[in-house]
Protein backbone atom coordinates (compact mmCIF):
# COMPACT_ATOMS: atom_id res chain seq x y z
CA UNK A 1 0.00 0.00 0.00
CA UNK A 2 1.06 3.61 -0.50
CA UNK A 3 2.33 5.67 2.39
CA UNK A 4 2.05 9.36 3.17
CA UNK A 5 4.94 11.36 1.80
CA UNK A 6 5.54 9.34 -1.36
CA UNK A 7 3.11 11.28 -3.53
CA UNK A 8 0.64 8.39 -3.69
CA UNK A 9 3.09 6.16 -5.53
CA UNK A 10 3.01 2.46 -4.73
CA UNK A 11 5.99 0.28 -4.05
CA UNK A 12 6.11 -3.47 -4.37
CA UNK A 13 8.08 -5.90 -2.30
CA UNK A 14 10.87 -7.69 -4.08
CA UNK A 15 10.45 -11.41 -4.57
CA UNK A 16 12.73 -14.29 -5.39
CA UNK A 17 13.01 -14.91 -9.09
CA UNK A 18 12.05 -11.39 -10.12
CA UNK A 19 14.59 -9.48 -12.16
CA UNK A 20 15.25 -5.81 -11.53
CA UNK A 21 13.71 -4.96 -14.91
CA UNK A 22 10.50 -6.88 -14.16
CA UNK A 23 10.18 -5.16 -10.78
CA UNK A 24 10.67 -1.78 -12.47
CA UNK A 25 7.99 -2.63 -15.06
CA UNK A 26 5.48 -3.70 -12.40
CA UNK A 27 6.24 -0.55 -10.38
CA UNK A 28 5.64 1.63 -13.44
CA UNK A 29 2.36 -0.14 -14.23
CA UNK A 30 1.09 0.31 -10.68
CA UNK A 31 1.79 4.04 -10.78
CA UNK A 32 0.67 4.74 -14.36
CA UNK A 33 -2.54 6.84 -14.43
CA UNK A 34 -3.39 5.55 -17.92
CA UNK A 35 -3.21 1.94 -16.70
CA UNK A 36 -5.56 2.75 -13.83
CA UNK A 37 -7.89 4.67 -16.16
CA UNK A 38 -7.98 1.78 -18.65
CA UNK A 39 -8.91 -0.64 -15.89
CA UNK A 40 -11.65 1.69 -14.64
CA UNK A 41 -13.13 2.31 -18.10
CA UNK A 42 -12.92 -1.27 -19.35
CA UNK A 43 -10.15 -0.93 -21.94
CA UNK A 44 -7.77 -3.84 -22.37
CA UNK A 45 -4.67 -1.65 -22.54
CA UNK A 46 -3.48 1.89 -21.87
CA UNK A 47 -2.76 2.16 -25.62
CA UNK A 48 -6.48 2.84 -26.12
CA UNK A 49 -5.89 6.41 -24.96
CA UNK A 50 -3.28 6.98 -27.64
CA UNK A 51 -5.93 6.35 -30.30
CA UNK A 52 -8.50 8.43 -28.42
CA UNK A 53 -6.09 11.37 -28.20
CA UNK A 54 -5.04 11.08 -31.85
CA UNK A 55 -8.67 11.01 -32.97
CA UNK A 56 -9.53 14.01 -30.80
CA UNK A 57 -6.83 15.94 -32.64
CA UNK A 58 -7.21 14.67 -36.22
CA UNK A 59 -10.87 13.48 -36.34
CA UNK A 60 -10.38 10.44 -38.58
CA UNK A 61 -12.66 7.88 -36.89
CA UNK A 62 -16.09 9.48 -36.99
CA UNK A 63 -18.13 8.35 -39.96
CA UNK A 64 -15.88 5.38 -40.74
CA UNK A 65 -17.84 2.36 -41.96
CA UNK A 66 -15.05 -0.19 -42.46
CA UNK A 67 -11.94 -0.37 -40.26
CA UNK A 68 -8.95 -2.74 -40.16
CA UNK A 69 -6.84 -3.04 -36.99
CA UNK A 70 -3.41 -4.53 -37.76
CA UNK A 71 -1.82 -6.19 -34.75
CA UNK A 72 -5.08 -6.05 -32.82
CA UNK A 73 -3.92 -7.85 -29.64
CA UNK A 74 -4.90 -7.24 -26.92
CA UNK A 75 -7.73 -5.22 -28.49
CA UNK A 76 -7.70 -1.75 -26.93
CA UNK A 77 -7.76 0.12 -30.24
CA UNK A 78 -10.66 -1.94 -31.57
CA UNK A 79 -12.58 -1.23 -28.36
CA UNK A 80 -12.16 2.49 -29.03
CA UNK A 81 -13.40 2.11 -32.60
CA UNK A 82 -16.46 0.19 -31.34
CA UNK A 83 -17.33 3.05 -28.99
CA UNK A 84 -16.72 5.87 -31.48
CA UNK A 85 -18.15 4.07 -34.55
CA UNK A 86 -20.70 1.57 -33.20
CA UNK A 87 -22.08 0.83 -36.67
CA UNK A 88 -18.71 0.24 -38.35
CA UNK A 89 -17.54 -3.14 -39.60
CA UNK A 90 -14.21 -3.90 -37.90
CA UNK A 91 -11.72 -6.63 -38.72
CA UNK A 92 -8.65 -7.17 -36.57
CA UNK A 93 -5.69 -9.35 -37.47
CA UNK A 94 -2.81 -10.63 -35.36
CA UNK A 95 -0.43 -13.56 -35.10
CA UNK A 96 -1.33 -13.73 -31.40
CA UNK A 97 -4.64 -15.11 -30.13
CA UNK A 98 -7.01 -12.32 -29.09
CA UNK A 99 -10.09 -12.60 -26.90
CA UNK A 100 -13.34 -11.86 -28.79
CA UNK A 101 -14.67 -8.31 -28.96
CA UNK A 102 -18.38 -7.78 -29.58
CA UNK A 103 -19.01 -6.43 -33.07
CA UNK A 104 -15.53 -7.20 -34.41
CA UNK A 105 -14.16 -10.02 -36.55
CA UNK A 106 -10.74 -11.22 -35.41
CA UNK A 107 -8.46 -13.23 -37.68
CA UNK A 108 -5.39 -14.99 -36.30
CA UNK A 109 -3.03 -14.85 -39.26
CA UNK A 110 -0.10 -12.94 -40.77
CA UNK A 111 -1.23 -9.72 -42.45
CA UNK A 112 1.81 -10.01 -44.75
CA UNK A 113 0.59 -13.30 -46.25
CA UNK A 114 -0.53 -13.17 -49.89
CA UNK A 115 -4.09 -14.09 -48.91
CA UNK A 116 -4.52 -11.44 -46.21
CA UNK A 117 -5.66 -8.37 -48.23
CA UNK A 118 -8.41 -10.26 -50.07
CA UNK A 119 -9.47 -12.14 -46.94
CA UNK A 120 -9.78 -8.95 -44.87
CA UNK A 121 -11.60 -7.08 -47.63
CA UNK A 122 -14.07 -9.96 -47.89
CA UNK A 123 -14.62 -9.99 -44.12
CA UNK A 124 -15.19 -6.21 -44.19
CA UNK A 125 -17.56 -6.34 -47.12
CA UNK A 126 -15.58 -3.85 -49.19
CA UNK A 127 -12.53 -1.57 -49.18
CA UNK A 128 -11.49 -0.09 -45.83
CA UNK A 129 -12.02 3.50 -44.77
CA UNK A 130 -9.21 3.26 -42.20
CA UNK A 131 -6.25 0.98 -41.53
CA UNK A 132 -4.91 1.26 -37.99
CA UNK A 133 -1.58 -0.13 -36.80
CA UNK A 134 -0.16 0.01 -33.28
CA UNK A 135 2.31 -2.76 -34.13
CA UNK A 136 5.92 -2.88 -33.03
CA UNK A 137 8.43 -5.66 -33.60
CA UNK A 138 9.66 -7.70 -30.65
CA UNK A 139 12.54 -5.75 -29.16
CA UNK A 140 16.07 -7.11 -28.69
CA UNK A 141 17.37 -4.23 -26.57
CA UNK A 142 19.46 -2.63 -29.32
CA UNK A 143 17.86 0.71 -30.23
CA UNK A 144 18.77 0.84 -33.93
CA UNK A 145 17.92 -2.82 -34.52
CA UNK A 146 14.57 -2.37 -32.78
CA UNK A 147 13.93 0.75 -34.88
CA UNK A 148 14.70 -0.99 -38.18
CA UNK A 149 12.60 -4.04 -37.33
CA UNK A 150 9.59 -1.95 -36.39
CA UNK A 151 10.01 0.28 -39.45
CA UNK A 152 9.95 -2.82 -41.65
CA UNK A 153 6.59 -3.68 -40.10
CA UNK A 154 5.25 -0.15 -40.62
CA UNK A 155 6.35 -0.17 -44.27
CA UNK A 156 4.65 -3.54 -44.76
CA UNK A 157 1.56 -2.03 -43.16
CA UNK A 158 1.74 0.88 -45.59
CA UNK A 159 1.89 -1.52 -48.55
CA UNK A 160 -1.03 -3.47 -47.11
CA UNK A 161 -3.04 -0.26 -46.63
CA UNK A 162 -2.46 0.69 -50.27
CA UNK A 163 -4.04 -2.64 -51.28
CA UNK A 164 -7.18 -2.45 -49.12
CA UNK A 165 -8.04 1.26 -48.63
CA UNK A 166 -10.69 3.06 -50.61
CA UNK A 167 -9.65 6.32 -52.32
CA UNK A 168 -9.73 9.03 -49.64
CA UNK A 169 -8.97 6.51 -46.88
CA UNK A 170 -6.70 6.89 -43.84
CA UNK A 171 -3.66 5.01 -42.50
CA UNK A 172 -2.59 5.55 -38.87
CA UNK A 173 0.54 3.78 -37.64
CA UNK A 174 3.07 3.75 -34.83
CA UNK A 175 6.63 4.67 -35.81
CA UNK A 176 9.89 4.55 -33.85
CA UNK A 177 12.23 7.49 -34.41
CA UNK A 178 15.67 6.56 -35.65
CA UNK A 179 16.39 7.53 -39.24
CA UNK A 180 14.51 5.07 -41.44
CA UNK A 181 11.28 6.94 -40.74
CA UNK A 182 12.21 9.63 -43.30
CA UNK A 183 11.83 7.20 -46.20
CA UNK A 184 8.45 6.08 -44.87
CA UNK A 185 7.16 9.65 -44.69
CA UNK A 186 8.27 10.26 -48.29
CA UNK A 187 6.40 7.15 -49.46
CA UNK A 188 3.28 8.15 -47.53
CA UNK A 189 3.33 11.61 -49.12
CA UNK A 190 3.36 9.90 -52.50
CA UNK A 191 0.31 7.81 -51.61
CA UNK A 192 -1.74 10.25 -49.49
CA UNK A 193 -2.72 13.90 -49.86
CA UNK A 194 -2.04 14.78 -46.21
CA UNK A 195 0.60 13.28 -43.90
CA UNK A 196 0.93 14.48 -40.30
CA UNK A 197 2.63 13.13 -37.22
CA UNK A 198 2.10 13.41 -33.48
CA UNK A 199 3.09 11.97 -30.14
CA UNK A 200 -0.06 11.69 -28.01
CA UNK A 201 0.13 12.49 -24.28
CA UNK A 202 -0.52 8.81 -23.48
CA UNK A 203 2.82 7.85 -25.06
CA UNK A 204 5.43 7.58 -22.36
CA UNK A 205 7.93 10.43 -22.35
CA UNK A 206 10.92 8.08 -22.53
CA UNK A 207 9.51 6.26 -25.57
CA UNK A 208 10.82 6.96 -29.07
CA UNK A 209 7.40 6.19 -30.57
CA UNK A 210 5.29 8.64 -32.51
CA UNK A 211 2.35 8.20 -34.84
CA UNK A 212 1.85 9.01 -38.49
CA UNK A 213 -1.61 10.03 -39.70
CA UNK A 214 -1.88 9.72 -43.48
CA UNK A 215 -5.21 10.90 -44.90
CA UNK A 216 -6.68 11.17 -48.39
CA UNK A 217 -5.45 7.95 -50.03
CA UNK A 218 -4.87 8.69 -53.72
CA UNK A 219 -5.66 5.19 -54.95
CA UNK A 220 -3.51 2.27 -56.00
CA UNK A 221 -0.69 3.42 -58.32
CA UNK A 222 -0.83 0.22 -60.37
CA UNK A 223 -4.53 0.78 -61.02
CA UNK A 224 -3.77 4.22 -62.43
CA UNK A 225 -0.98 2.77 -64.55
CA UNK A 226 -3.22 0.04 -65.93
CA UNK A 227 -5.60 2.64 -67.40
CA UNK A 228 -2.81 4.00 -69.55
CA UNK A 229 -1.84 0.65 -71.03
UniProtKB/Swiss-Prot annotation:
Keyword Protein biosynthesis set for record: no
Protein's UniProt name: Ribosomal RNA large subunit methyltransferase E
Residues annotated to bind S-adenosyl-L-methionine: 75, 77, 94, 110, 134
GO cellular component terms, semicolon-separated: cytoplasm
Domain of life: Bacteria
Alphabetical list of Gene3D superfamilies matching this protein: Vaccinia Virus protein VP39 (3.40.50.150)
Reactions the enzyme catalyzes: uridine(2552) in 23S rRNA + S-adenosyl-L-methionine = 2'-O-methyluridine(2552) in 23S rRNA + S-adenosyl-L-homocysteine + H(+)
Subcellular location: Cytoplasm
Role noted for this protein: Specifically methylates the uridine in position 2552 of 23S rRNA at the 2'-O position of the ribose in the fully assembled 50S ribosomal subunit.
InterPro entries attached to this UniProt entry: RNA_methyltr_RlmE, RNA_MeTrfase_FtsJ_dom, rRNA-MeTfrase_E, SAM-dependent_MTases_sf
Amino acid sequence: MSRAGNGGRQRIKTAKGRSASSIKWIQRQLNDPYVRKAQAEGYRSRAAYKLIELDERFHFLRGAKRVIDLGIAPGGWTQVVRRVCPQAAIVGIDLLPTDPIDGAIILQMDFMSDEAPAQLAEALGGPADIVLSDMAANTVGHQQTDHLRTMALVEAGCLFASEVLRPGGTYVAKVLAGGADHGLVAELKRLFTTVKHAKPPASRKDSSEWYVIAQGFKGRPEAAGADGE
